[in-house]
Amino acid sequence: MTILASISSIGNVKSISKSNNFSSLSNSSLQSSNSIQCGCGGGSPLIGTVGNLVGGVLVGTGIILGTVVGTVNGVVGGLLSGPNCGCH
């Protein structure tokens, strides 16, 4: 009985450590978005603002958070794709 309890507690610790890794990465992505500016020209102001926020997060983290923001990347990327988009 104690062996099963220890195994289940080890599984819980692993899941907690994974969630902590994602939270720390999301914090770094928010910090990196302050230094990177992204946007698209010729669009509505609302779409431009969303492009600046989401673009900074995606560029700052790269592929590390691809699994977390994959859905957001697909939706926003389709809306913001165009020749006048860029980051600096």
From Swiss-Prot:
GO terms (BP aspect): sorocarp development
Domain of life of the native organism: Eukaryota
Pfam families: Coiled (PF05710)
Family statement: Belongs to the hssA/B family.
Entries under PANTHER family matching the protein: HSSA/B-LIKE PROTEIN 17-RELATED, HSSA_B-LIKE PROTEIN 17-RELATED
Name the record gives this protein: HssA/B-like protein 11
Lineage: Eukaryota, Amoebozoa, Evosea, Eumycetozoa, Dictyostelia
